[in-house]
Amino acid sequence: MDYKQILNIAVLAGEIMLRSGAETYRVEDTMKHILNTARTEVAEAFVMMTGIVATLDNQDMEMLTAMRRVHDRGTNMHRIVQVNEISRRYCRGEMTVEETYEELKQIKGKLYSVAIYNLATILVPVGFAPLFGGGVKETLVSAAAGCVLAFLITLGKKIQMSSFILNAICAFGVAVTAACVSRVTSGWNLDIVIISSLMPLVPGVAITNAIRDTLRGDYISGGARILEAFLTAAAIGLGAGVGMIFVGALYPGGVV
């Protein structure tokens, strides 16, 4: 039996799931099921927000351990579902080790294109504006702010800007755009536009996963996710506040 390849499959599956926003307990569970197909005495998986460790050990082999760092994380539920389905098929014996590895490699390479990501970034504010009580004007201004947000996110990722600074700059850009438009037009609610336009940045999934990990006893990952969500929220608030002050929208007297 190719123990090394089974280990590689488990680590690759875990990496894809963790990058796609899966909870750490779910990643560990999937990896453990894959590792158990090796039928070794020791088959362990340890997952944190930024890394994965997996080990296989038996009397007739040298211990095998693999570690993978995970730097970039996002949200892609479809990829999580795909990995779960492939892992189940492999564990049921419907796929070989080689077939499973190739399928996982294909999933890892499937990412949203920049155009699709930017389109979604624009449509989210457009969808939330009516939900928050906005009318046609709020929706149109939210679309404009969404375009600015999409541009800043694309630029920030291209130059590999840190997430805290990128979130702050994006919130700043959204607030400045909305506040500047409010100076030349009237008859719409500035708060609705800013809140709607910032929704793509809100760490809702991160907070949910943090609570799930914490309730399952994974305090390290849960605490790390809570801290990440808090820093994201702080960056959004800082950027939006500075942006409004910058254009004199927060204080009628002008910039302070």
PLM region descriptions:
Residues 111-188:
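Core alpha-helical transmembrane segments of integral membrane proteins
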Residues 68-72, 132-138, 189-193, 254-256:
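Interfacial loop-to-helix junctions that mark the boundaries of transmembrane helices
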Residues 72-138, 228-237, 248:
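Alpha-helical transmembrane segments and their cytosolic membrane-interface
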Residues 2, 19, 23, 75-78, ...:
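Catalytic cores of large soluble enzymes that bind and process phosphate-bearing ligands
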